[in-house]
Amino acid sequence: MPELPEVETVRLGLQPAMEGFRIDRAMANRCDLRFPFQPDFAARLTGQTITGLGRRAKYLLADLSSGDVLLMHLGMSGSFRVVNGAGDATPGEFHHPRSEDRTHDHVVFEMSSGARVIFNDPRRFGFMKIFARAAIDDEPHLKGLGPEPLGNAFDAAMLARACAGKQTSLKAALLDQRVVAGLGNIYVCEALWRAHLSPKRKASTLADRKGAPTDRAVRLVDAIRAVLGDAIKAGGSSLRDHRQTSGELGYFQHSFAVYDREGERCRTPGCNGTVKRLVQNGRSTFWCSGCQT
């Protein structure tokens, strides 16, 4: 499933074709994806201008001139294709090669920019939903999400407070979207390596006895921000499912220090350890026991 950098790269790729432009026509080519489309889905979108295209955690949010918001989630295999006079491009094609099977083109937006924006999703784990902007605080998919890891609200003090007293592993805590929004398996592994912290360490050790952030919390916040920033600049990680809107693959996977590198030499200078793999909560964790403590 795409993580924050992949979704952000998709957002950046869609902006030139969608933000500030009117949806001249919206079409849903089937009655459902992961969830059924609302009965008035196409009608509520057609004729509306996308006044802003944002992101919250792993969700894309299109603000509409009607006061509604279109929430979009890529799921496991969803991708957007932008077709215009310049050709055919796919923002954020990272994990799976883009499906060439047009029978999986499930949603089409014909924009006043002249572009056709097409959502293709072979597995149909993605979904789209419209809700009123005024009700955003009550939207179930967004309610309870933690702070954005690249936002000002995310700092060592906040992370220490969120993890104080937690006996769960540090890896599990970071994957909890209530603690911090948008992180997934890849970037948690990479951030823990950069911060030299074991994924098995208790989350509570990010706070001291008084609840103040320890040096570990400071290092981890810096590492999370850095790894996400680097991944966005690189266009995400091309492992299985998603390409950029340009159709190009992301390149951050070439910079992986530990993820999917089991048995290889650790890249920390002076460390003679090797990358190990363990399973935590049903997910593979990659780490170096030599320098991550």
Swiss-Prot record:
Cofactor dependence is on: Zn(2+)
Tell me which EC number(s) this protein carries.
3.2.2.23, 4.2.99.18
User: Catalysed reaction(s)?
Assistant: Hydrolysis of DNA containing ring-opened 7-methylguanine residues, releasing 2,6-diamino-4-hydroxy-5-(N-methyl)formamidopyrimidine; 2'-deoxyribonucleotide-(2'-deoxyribose 5'-phosphate)-2'-deoxyribonucleotide-DNA = a 3'-end 2'-deoxyribonucleotide-(2,3-dehydro-2,3-deoxyribose 5'-phosphate)-DNA + a 5'-end 5'-phospho-2'-deoxyribonucleoside-DNA + H(+)
Task: Give the annotated active site.
Answer: 2-3, 58, 283
User: Could you tell me which cysteines form disulfide bridges?
Assistant: none
Cofactor note (record):
Binds 1 zinc ion per subunit.
Q: Which InterPro entries match?
A: DNA_glyclase/AP_lyase_DNA-bd (IPR015886), DNA_glyclase_Znf_dom_DNA_BS (IPR015887), Formamido-pyr_DNA_Glyclase (IPR020629), FPG_cat (IPR012319), MutM-like_N-ter (IPR035937), Ribosomal_uS13-like_H2TH (IPR010979), Znf_DNA_glyclase/AP_lyase (IPR000214)
- Look up the coiled coil feature and give its residue ranges: none
Name of a matching Pfam family: Fapy_DNA_glyco
The UniProt keywords, alphabetically, are: DNA damage, DNA repair, DNA-binding, Glycosidase, Hydrolase, Lyase, Metal-binding, Multifunctional enzyme, Zinc, Zinc-finger
Q: Name one GO biological process term.
A: base-excision repair
**UniProt-annotated binding residues for DNA:** 104, 123, 166
Q: Which chain segments does UniProt annotate as zinc-finger regions (FPG-type)?
A: 257-293
What SMART domains does this protein's entry cite?
Answer: Fapy_DNA_glyco, H2TH
Q: Which GO terms describe its molecular function?
A: 8-oxo-7,8-dihydroguanine DNA N-glycosylase activity; class I DNA-(apurinic or apyrimidinic site) endonuclease activity; damaged DNA binding; zinc ion binding
State whether it acts alone or in a complex, and with which partners, per the record: Monomer.
Family from the record = Belongs to the FPG family.
Q: Which NCBIfam families match?
A: fpg (TIGR00577), PRK01103.1 (NF002211)
Purpose? Involved in base excision repair of DNA damaged by oxidation or by mutagenic agents. Acts as a DNA glycosylase that recognizes and removes damaged bases. Has a preference for oxidized purines, such as 7,8-dihydro-8-oxoguanine (8-oxoG). Has AP (apurinic/apyrimidinic) lyase activity and introduces nicks in the DNA strand. Cleaves the DNA backbone by beta-delta elimination to generate a single-strand break at the site of the removed base with both 3'- and 5'-phosphates.
Q: Output the HAMAP family linked to this UniProt entry.
A: Fapy_DNA_glycosyl (MF_00103)
Name recorded for this polypeptide: Formamidopyrimidine-DNA glycosylase
Protein's organism: Rhodopseudomonas palustris (strain HaA2)
